[in-house]
């Protein structure tokens, strides 16, 4: 496997290292073979979990196979955060990345906040716009989103339901 541009890293409560990278940024200069004729030269899945020794524990991620019942994967992967309940939060900073995603630490989709490709600007309480970072406050179970690439704010949602709380 090859890594594309690495755009996020976090350490969970078990001291595991989580990495998100951009598989679509590998090219012929990275010895990436477009016809995938060798295992060595394929991009890794976007989300990677490592132990402290650098051993790969698992990998997952990418577009949902059924968008009607799934989620909208980021156009450009950007940012990863593992919360106090071991949920993995992801964001993107591509032009259509107006949502954030929540998964279990095994890669099962849980929640999407926002609709991909829709933004109403900095006063929009339903969508983000190229989120810069995510953090969850355990005491209130609120997710704080640094929504600063496309908007200019920090917006807060309920981490379980995705309901808007405040800006």
What are these regions (language model features)?
Residues 1-167:
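Eukaryotic scaffold repeat domains enriched in small/polar residues
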